[in-house]
Amino acid sequence: MEVNGTANILSSAFLAVEFVDSFLPQNPLQEPFKHAWNHMLQNYTKFQIATWGSLIVHELIYFLFCLPGFIFQFLPFMQKYKIQPDKPETWEKQWKCFKMLLFNHFCIQLPLICGTYYFTEFFSIPYDWDTMPRWPFLLAQCFGCAVIEDTWHYFLHRALHHRRIYKYIHKVHHDFTSPFGMQAEYAHPLETLILGAGFFIGTMVFCNHMILLWAWVTFRLLETIDVHSGYDIPLNPLHLIPFYAGARFHDFHHMNFVGNYGSTFTWWDRLFDTDSQFNKHYSHHKTAKSD
């Protein structure tokens, strides 16, 4: 009964989105995007698109999304939104982070990205424009990928905090007790592989077009950079996502080292009561702020 009820809710939500979409004017960017996509297909092989194209998307999106947080450190009026104002970013920390990122991106992630082509070939994932899913489907698929990745991340992340293995792997990610956006993928190579597997599980379940892979990469990077940003900015559109964790939730994990293990959502932490210390801390913070 619960499964049927959930299915009915999702079906109704999708029909509502379709209904709203029918009244929206045609996207003026659709034709230029279609032209650019077809131009890419005509001038590059599938291997080039799946490997070098995916690498370019990842690097461009990653550092583009890191840019606002990097600029915030130079803007005095943004410091009121910094969650740990007593721990500013330093050039030394950022340079250390950047060097680790370059190693992880090109020595760990690039070989994995090279496997994207063989993944799309094995599962017959299309690249063409005509079979590209419409935006309601794309959003739903990205959400499904996020649910799977968050579940994997919660349990494996929590396991990496076990006292017998923490200092060997996950401790690297906790080098910075006050996170900043660029630190999102700063991790031990083994952690990159272990937690990164959750990204690919969702892709294997939901991917039915090359564009979904790039859309999911974009959303995942946006989310992880946001929660590591160190800034709790009001009117953040990501907070419209139900059960979204956000920067303050994850910042506490870096400050406290335990609890708040979810990557995107808060439901697993609520279910297993691993957010209890955060809830007490946040209640105290709100009380102090109101006084």
UniProtKB/Swiss-Prot annotation:
Pathway in which this enzyme or protein is active: Steroid biosynthesis; zymosterol biosynthesis; zymosterol from lanosterol: step 3/6
Q: Which residues form the Fatty acid hydroxylase domain?
A: 145-274
- Where is it found, in Gene Ontology cellular component terms? endoplasmic reticulum membrane
The UniProt catalytic activity note for this protein reads: 4,4-dimethyl-5alpha-cholest-7-en-3beta-ol + 6 Fe(II)-[cytochrome b5] + 3 O2 + 5 H(+) = 4alpha-carboxy-4beta-methyl-5alpha-cholest-7-ene-3beta-ol + 6 Fe(III)-[cytochrome b5] + 4 H2O
Where does motif Histidine box-1 map?
Answer: 157-161
**Domain notes from UniProt:** The histidine box domains may contain the active site and/or be involved in metal ion binding.
Q: What does the record give as EC number? A: 1.14.18.9
- Per its record, what are the GO molecular function terms? C-4 methylsterol oxidase activity; iron ion binding
For this chain, the family text in UniProt reads:
Belongs to the sterol desaturase family.
Keywords of this entry: Endoplasmic reticulum, Iron, Lipid biosynthesis, Lipid metabolism, Membrane, NAD, Oxidoreductase, Steroid biosynthesis, Steroid metabolism, Sterol biosynthesis, Sterol metabolism, Transmembrane, Transmembrane helix
Protein name in the entry = Methylsterol monooxygenase 1
Q: Where are the membrane-spanning stretches?
A: 55-75, 100-120, 199-219
Membrane topology (UniProt): Multi-pass membrane protein
Q: Where in the cell is it found?
A: Endoplasmic reticulum membrane
Record Pfam families = FA_hydroxylase
PANTHER family according to UniProt: STEROL DESATURASE
